[in-house]
């Protein structure tokens, strides 16, 4: 009986001794060893409002070899530069018993994953593609470790194909993940393996980012801004998008003749030969007897002169310049006349004379004055009083002619009246018998006192005794005078 009692006492003691660490281990699993991962996304707060100073750890934890496997089942997973991750882990407790503990894990998609404490359990956690500031705190009984990362946006690489990746510019943290589930041998501790970037305040030009996809790796280099200044977000296409855009791009090879254009200048003529072209209906094509035109040899000046004269009949090489643009025809001894430009060099004097003829049109167009040296507009050069002066002169001449005509008429009438009055007075004096000089009076009127018979044409004497003075002879006159005396 004694050995039996002693053996039972030893067994009870061993059971008590074994039950005490198991209880403490269970409590540790519930409090210390349980890993709780909560992801809280805040889309309203900007990244610059988060703290940017780092607090060093107050305690040193022994390294625990832990492998993490993450997968992104949601292809439309969004990124948030303001998301915060809080991780509680126990780095000192190792599971030695087969007790089971349930660890609630909250992912970005809102799913809760329960993991057991056995060695055969598998934990799969959906990670967001962009990690924000991470606050990791371990809560053992005597240790208090708090780590705060800078609030600058972080950049990571994910192994989720067919998923566009967007990241924020700034300092970066690289997280390598693969889509596989990992089982822990003795514990269910979850750790975030983070590579902290440079301290706040440092700036770089470009930071290479490695984007890992199954089978294809594409390096992407993005410029970084200083941490102090707020940086926007930039969309970085994945390797699949890069491959698609590269395959759709094809280089454009310029097709057509590669003959370089050449230019010749000779005096007032300028010829430009363009590359050879194909003939069509809208081109003026000239067939040539020689194929040396626009083939490197100088052009025929006579040919150019004819073309320029056809464009302008009054073309003068001394005053005008002619520019021609020709192009040879492919597989043919012909050229196409593409353009003929005649440039006329006019002197300022010639332009002034042309504008003077159109001064009224220029005035309507808004031109007020024009001058060339001392010459001005046509109205300034002309006498404004010339027309009224001419009219005045013509009127005065007409008036003078009219006055002269009136004076001549009046003077003639007056002279005629005087003659008639004198004759009337003489006749009245003769009739009254008053003779100042009787001899003169008798001599003046001999025909009145002469009496002679008039002989008719037949020789007969007429009854008339008055004979005209012209028919009297000198002898008759003498006889009359003697008789009168």
Swiss-Prot record:
Residues 1-24 form the signal peptide. Residues 408-485 are cytoplasmic. N- and O-linked glycosylated. Sialoglycoprotein. The modification Phosphoserine is found at residue 464. Residues 26-57, 110-128, 135-149, 163-176, 186-228, 235-253 have a biased composition (Polar residues). It comes from the Eukaryota. Keywords: Cell adhesion, Cell membrane, Cell projection, Glycoprotein, Membrane, Phosphoprotein, Signal, Transmembrane, Transmembrane helix. It is found in: Apical cell membrane; Cell projection, Microvillus; Membrane raft; Cell projection, Lamellipodium. It comes from Rattus norvegicus. This is Podocalyxin. Involved in the regulation of both adhesion and cell morphology and cancer progression. Functions as an anti-adhesive molecule that maintains an open filtration pathway between neighboring foot processes in the podocyte by charge repulsion. Acts as a pro-adhesive molecule, enhancing the adherence of cells to immobilized ligands, increasing the rate of migration and cell-cell contacts in an integrin-dependent manner. Induces the formation of apical actin-dependent microvilli. Glycans are attached at residues 29, 82, 135, 144, 156, 187, 287. Both the O-glycan-rich domain of the extracellular domain and the C-terminus PDZ-binding motif (DTHL) in the cytoplasmic tail harbor an apical sorting signal. The cytoplasmic domain is necessary for the apical membrane targeting and renal tubulogenesis. The large highly anionic extracellular domain allows to maintain open filtration pathways between neighboring podocyte foot processes. The cytoplasmic C-terminus PDZ-binding motif (DTHL) is essential for interaction with NHERF1 and for targeting NHERF1 to the apical cell membrane. The extracellular domain is necessary for microvillus formation. Glomerular epithelium cell (podocyte) (at protein level). The chain crosses the membrane at residues 387-407.
């Amino acid at each position: 009986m004694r050995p039996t009692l002693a053996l039972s006492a030893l067994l009870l003691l061993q059971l008590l001794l074994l039950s005490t660490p198991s209880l403490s281990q269970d409590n540790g699993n519930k409090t210390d060893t349980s890993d709780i991962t909560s992801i809280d996304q805040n889309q309203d707060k900007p990244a610059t409002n988060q703290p940017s100073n780092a607090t060093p750890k107050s305690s040193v934890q022994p390294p625990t070899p832990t492998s993490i496997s993450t997968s992104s089942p949601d292809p439309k997973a969004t990124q948030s530069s303001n998301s915060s991750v809080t991780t509680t882990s126990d780095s000192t407790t190792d599971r030695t018993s087969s007790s089971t503990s349930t660890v609630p894990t909250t992912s970005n998609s809102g799913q809760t994953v329960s993991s057991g404490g056995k060695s055969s359990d598998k934990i799969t956690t959906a990670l967001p593609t962009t990690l924000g500031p991470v606050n990791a705190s371990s809560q053992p009984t005597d240790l208090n470790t708090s780590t705060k990362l800078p609030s600058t946006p972080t950049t990571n690489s994910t192994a989720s194909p067919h998923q566009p990746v967007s990241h924020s510019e700034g300092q970066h943290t690289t997280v390598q993940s693969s889509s596989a589930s990992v089982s822990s041998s003795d514990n269910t501790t979850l750790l975030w393996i983070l590579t902290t970037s440079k301290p706040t305040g440092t700036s770089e030009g470009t930071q290479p980012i490695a984007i890992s996809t199954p089978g294809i790796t594409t390096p992407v280099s993005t410029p970084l801004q200083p941490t102090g200044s707020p940086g926007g977000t930039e969309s970085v296409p994945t390797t699949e998008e890069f491959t698609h855009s590269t395959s759709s791009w094809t280089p454009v090879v310029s097709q057509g003749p590669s003959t370089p254009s050449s230019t010749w200048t000779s005096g007032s003529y300028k010829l430009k030969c363009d590359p050879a072209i194909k003939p069509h209906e809208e081109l003026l094509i000239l067939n040539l007897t020689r194929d040396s035109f626009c083939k490197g040899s100088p052009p025929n000046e006579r040919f150019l002169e004819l073309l320029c004269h056809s464009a302008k009949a009054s073309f003068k090489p001394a005053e005008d310049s002619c520019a021609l643009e020709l192009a040879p025809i492919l597989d043919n001894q012909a050229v196409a006349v593409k353009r003929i430009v005649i440039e006329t060099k006019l002197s300022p004097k010639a332009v002034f004379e042309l504008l003077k003829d159109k001064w009224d049109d220029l005035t309507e167009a808004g031109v007020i004055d024009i001058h060339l040296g001392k010459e001005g507009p046509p109205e300034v050069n002309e006498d404004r009083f010339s027309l009224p002066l001419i009219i005045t002169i013509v009127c005065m001449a007409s008036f003078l002619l009219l006055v002269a005509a009136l004076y001549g008429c009046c003077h003639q009438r007056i002279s005629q009246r005087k003659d008639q009055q004198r004759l009337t007075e003489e006749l009245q004096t003769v009739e009254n018998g008053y003779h100042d000089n009787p001899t003169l009076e008798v001599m003046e009127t001999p025909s009145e006192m002469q009496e002679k018979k008039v002989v008719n044409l037949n020789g007969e004497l007429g009854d008339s005794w008055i004979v005209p003075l012209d028919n009297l002879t000198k002898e008759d006159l003498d006889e009359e005078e003697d008789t009168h005396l």
